[in-house]
Curated annotation (Swiss-Prot):
GO biological process: angiotensin maturation; protein catabolic process
Residues annotated as the enzyme's active site: S554 (charge relay system), D641 (charge relay system), H680 (charge relay system)
Protein name (database record): Prolyl endopeptidase
Tissue occurrence: Expressed in all tissues tested: uterus, kidney, heart, lung, small intestine, smooth muscle, liver, spleen, thymus, adrenal, pituitary and whole brain.
Modification N-acetylmethionine, positions: M1
Enzymatic reactions: Hydrolysis of Pro-|-Xaa >> Ala-|-Xaa in oligopeptides
Any Pfam family the entry gives: Peptidase_S9
Length: 710
């Protein structure tokens, strides 16, 4: 029996907020100040019990050693052409950050173009976004430090990889779009704010602006091109049309797949970009998504979900843009979701569909929309693509649960459009033929069939004896497609585990209908779908509740925390990474206001009632039955997470330890680990990734008594 002495934590019982006549106590509101001595002491006290617990997990050393060994395989991106040169990203295996290489031809010698590993000693400075000028002679790139969303943009001359003096600050959630003359670039920035902006602050991000930077000038001289003073939450990203004539401005209000679309004809203004652009408001509502694909003169092709939840391709003529005049180029598919489209070799379109959570890649004719070819693909995901309108070739990258990656190359100038394997990677030490992946469709509470992938060793007995690791996300129209994960395969190989990934509602797996089925008033469907996935795994003999771990990050952290509250008896272990835990206040911090499109907002009485029912922070209660306790729980967060600020996890763990952890029947640990110089996830250095997964799987092994299998 494990029993814990948790830190004594001050509760401010006078901290009460009134929501529509409901008095809600918030005794740990003081943890919302990341800079107070009290918060720092709280974090230190929590890490003091968690770190030794993790370090004493018997398999942590074995796991970390194996992870370091198996993760040491080469990782490549697709090649992409810019100007006369080819570029690609490559990580030799264990480098903290991947390196950008350049070649003069596909057969030419590869040279390092930009190595982010040289920018910090510990790998915590990461590349976050980049853009080449149209002729491929200039390169803009964003850098973020310690995992923060704040970005500094710098510039290089491509010839000789020469650093330029230009620097752009106060940049976040930015576009990077060069005008075709190569003179400058559109980007987004936020107004100055009080206090610091290093990713440890919690202040809200409002009033994003679109600016134009002229190469060789100071940022103070940049031109303001669009702002929305009456709509502080709006964010507007610019892109240039393929012919360079039009600037297209997509305006988003939150995370819903809907945007306004304004444009400016750069040939109309004779004196260049010197102020707010003359925007034509082509689409001036939030009733659909319009994703620019290409244009032939004034006829523009968009991917849209307007009256087509699975998406279709339409043509809009800017000279006659009334909706009644729109033409359908590729109609909506009744089942498959159109994920992305690219124009290549001037008259082809590459379309990527999602069919039952597996990708399909097709070539169509730009003029007629007709299907020309379906590219052969195994069961899995297309995770990389390159090829633009002016290119005559494409590269695409495939991966699956058991294949780390194959990159294909297809020359579109040939009669026979046959892709060839350009590069294939294998991982030494994991033989894919020992394992199998199956997809099942299990019923949720309301009868909806939910897809789930299950990966396990071939020939296992379904006798309930296996530990299982169930992952889910369920939000923001994001589809969780098959991906290669060494850390999870080690669980399958060396911990005798079963890996399951449930494609619950809220995601985009079946288009906007699936997304809407798991948001706002329907958010409980996500939790029901996930709990039914767990019940399916138990019923079919893969595992038992005591041997089942659930895991999710961000919105998935909310998912697993809510499920632990609702069904503590159903899980043995819960690992919640950077989760959204305070559903009444999330919109007040950094970019949280953008998530109200999925969650709603407690400022509304109706939304407040939905949120209060499942908010992890507000639904912790000691199980009534004597033989039921909370599962072992590990929360993970980090000091520079300015997407989902750490206060969510801090307040939640304090509440768990107070309400549940003090009970004598609660022998399972309730712990948090707060990392430093780390953020929400993007750009995390390899060394930190290895430490994090070693902590996670060591915690699972210790709490569920799992032996290491050599």
């Amino acid at each position: 029996m494990l029993s814990f002495q948790y830190p004594d934590v001050y509760r401010d019982e006078t901290s009460v907020q009134d929501y529509h006549g409901h008095k809600i106590c918030d005794p740990y509101a003081w943890l919302e100040d990341p800079d107070s001595e009290q918060t720092k002491a709280f974090v230190e006290a929590q890490n003091k019990i968690t770190v030794p617990f993790l370090e004493q997990c018997p398999i942590r050393g074995l796991y970390k050693e194996r992870m370091t060994e198996l993760y040491d395989y080469p990782k490549y991106s697709c090649h992409f052409k810019k100007g006369k040169r080819y570029f690609y990203f490559y990580n030799t295996g264990l480098q903290n950050q991947r390196v950008l290489y350049v070649q003069d031809s596909l057969e030419g010698e590869a040279r390092v173009f930009l190595d982010p590993n040289t920018l910090s000693d510990d790998g915590t400075v990461a590349l976050r976004g980049y853009a080449f000028s149209e002729d491929g002679e200039y390169f803009a790139y964003g850098l973020s430090a310690s995992g923060s969303d704040w970005v500094t943009i710098k510039f290089m001359k491509v010839d000789g990889a020469k650093e330029l003096p230009d620097v752009l600050e106060r940049v976040k959630f930015t576009c990077m779009a060069w005008t075709h003359d190569g003179k400058g670039m559109f980007y987004n920035s936020y107004p100055q704010q009080d206090g610091k902006s290093d990713g440890t602050e919690t202040s809200t991000n409002l009033h994003q602006k679109l600016c134009y930077h002229v190469l060789g000038t100071d940022q103070s001289e940049d031109v303001l091109c669009a702002e929305f003073p009456d709509e502080p939450k709006w964010m507007g990203g610019a892109e240039l049309s393929d012919d360079g004539r039009y600037v297209l401005l997509s305006i988003w209000e939150g995370c819903d797949p809907v945007n306004r679309l304004w444009y400016c004809d750069l040939q109309q203004g004779s004196n260049g970009i010197n102020g707010i652009l003359k925007w034509v408001k082509l689409i001036d509502n939030f009733e659909g998504e319009y994703d620019y694909i290409t244009n032939e003169g004034t006829v523009f092709t968009f991917k849209t979900n307007r009256n087509s939840p699975n998406y279709r391709l339409i043509n809009i003529d800017f000279t006659d843009p009334d909706e009644s005049k729109w033409k359908v180029l590729v109609p909506e598919h009744e089942k498959d979701v159109l994920e992305w489209v690219a124009c290549v070799r001037s008259n082809f379109l590459v379309l990527c569909y999602l069919r039952n959570v597996k990708n399909i890649l097709q070539l169509h004719d730009l003029t007629t929309g007709a299907l020309l070819k379906t590219f052969p693909l195994d069961v899995g995901s297309v995770v990389g693509y390159s090829g633009r309108k002016k290119d005559s070739e494409i590269f695409y990258q495939f991966t699956s649960f058991l294949s780390p990656g194959v990159i294909y190359h297809c020359d579109l100038t040939r009669e026979e459009l046959e892709p060839r394997v350009f590069r294939e990677v294998t991982v030494k030490g994991i033989d894919a033929s020992d394992y199998q992946t199956i997809q099942v469709f299990y019923p949720s509470k309301d009868g909806t069939k939910i897809p789930m992938f299950i990966v396990h060793k071939k020939g296992i007995k379904l006798d309930g004896s296996h530990p299982a690791f169930l992952y889910g996300y369920g939000g923001f129209n994001i589809s969780i497609t098959p991906n290669y994960s060494v850390s999870r395969l080690i669980f399958v190989r060396h911990m005798g585990g079963v890996l399951a990934v449930a494609n619950i509602r809220g995601g985009g797996e079946y288009g906007e209908t699936w997304h809407k089925g798991g948001i706002l008033a329907n958010k409980q469907n996500c939790f029901d779908d996930f709990q039914c996935a767990a019940e399916y795994l138990i019923k079919e003999g893969y595992t038992t509740s005591k041997r089942l771990t659930i895991n999710g990050g961000s919105n998935g952290g909310l998912l697993v925390a809510a499920c632990a509250n609702q069904r503590p008896d159903l899980f043995g272990c819960v690992i919640a990474q950077v989760g959204v835990m305070d559903m009444l206040k999330f919109h007040k911090f950094t970019i949280g206001h953008a998530w109200t499109t999925d969650y709603g907002c407690s400022d509304s009485k109706q939304h407040f009632e939905w949120l209060l029912k499942y908010s992890p922070l507000h639904n912790v209660k000691l199980p009534e039955a004597d033989d039921i306790q909370y599962p072992s729980m590990l929360l993970l967060t980090a000091d520079h997470d300015d997407r989902v600020v750490p206060l969510h996890s801090l307040k939640f763990i304090a509440t768990l330890q107070y309400i549940v952890g003090r009970s004598r029947k609660q022998s399972n640990p309730l712990l948090i680990h707060v990392d430093t110089k780390a953020g929400h996830g993007p750009g995390k250095p390899t060394a930190k990734v290895i430490e994090e997964v070693s902590d996670m799987f060591a915690f699972i092994a210790r709490c569920l008594n799992i032996e290491w299998i050599q």
